Swiss-Prot record:
<dbReference type="InterPro" id="IPR009050">
    <property type="entry name" value="Globin-like_sf"/>
</dbReference>
<keyword id="KW-0813">Transport</keyword>
<dbReference type="GO" id="GO:0015671">
    <property type="term" value="P:oxygen transport"/>
</dbReference>
<keyword id="KW-0408">Iron</keyword>
<keyword id="KW-0539">Nucleus</keyword>
<keyword id="KW-1003">Cell membrane</keyword>
<dbReference type="GO" id="GO:0005652">
    <property type="term" value="C:nuclear lamina"/>
</dbReference>
<dbReference type="GO" id="GO:0005344">
    <property type="term" value="F:oxygen carrier activity"/>
</dbReference>
<keyword id="KW-0561">Oxygen transport</keyword>
<feature type="binding site" description="distal binding residue">
    <location>
        <position position="77"/>
    </location>
    <ligand>
        <name>heme</name>
    </ligand>
</feature>
<keyword id="KW-0449">Lipoprotein</keyword>
<dbReference type="InterPro" id="IPR044399">
    <property type="entry name" value="Mb-like_M"/>
</dbReference>
<dbReference type="GO" id="GO:0001666">
    <property type="term" value="P:response to hypoxia"/>
</dbReference>
<dbReference type="Pfam" id="PF00042">
    <property type="entry name" value="Globin"/>
</dbReference>
<dbReference type="GO" id="GO:0016020">
    <property type="term" value="C:membrane"/>
</dbReference>
<dbReference type="GO" id="GO:0005737">
    <property type="term" value="C:cytoplasm"/>
</dbReference>
<protein>
    <recommendedName>
        <fullName>Globin-like protein 26</fullName>
    </recommendedName>
</protein>
Amino acid sequence: MGSSTSTPAPPPKKNKPEGRKADNQILNSYQKSIVRNAWRHMSQKGPSNCGSTITRRMMARKSTIGDILDRSTLDYHNLQIVEFLQKVMQSLDEPDKISKLCQEIGQKHAKYRRSKGMKIDYWDKLGEAITETIREYQGWKIHRESLRAATVLVSYVVDQLRFGYSRGLHVQGSRETKEDDEE
């Protein structure tokens, strides 16, 4: 397997119309307010319920995800998803914190590529499941700006998770190549 010494560059932040938000912000203040309200509504339904809805949707979109999420760890993952989303909501004013969190999680999951067959597109399935769950939990309250804000945030989160995952694969590949050279 060929090895490169460079690490992939982080994904660029999405371009938004000028004047809508501060330079380094993912969402403008109105969008943050909408997303926070949606999250409050979702988390009132019970955190594990929200997490299990997301997990169930992911597995429905890609059945092989169920192979990675052992039945014995489903409850754990349901709670982890909710805790992750809670941290994202708490950090909406600090996009660098969101990036770091997502990249760390993505990188930690790289080890599952070889052992369980995890693929990078599973992060997309997670994003789709989160977006659908937000739509469901908002019910009749849905309006365009709310969906747009959720989509922008989820896209950013997924891009950062994918970047961390790719970086983790790169680090693993470098380690494996080094180990092969030493043998």
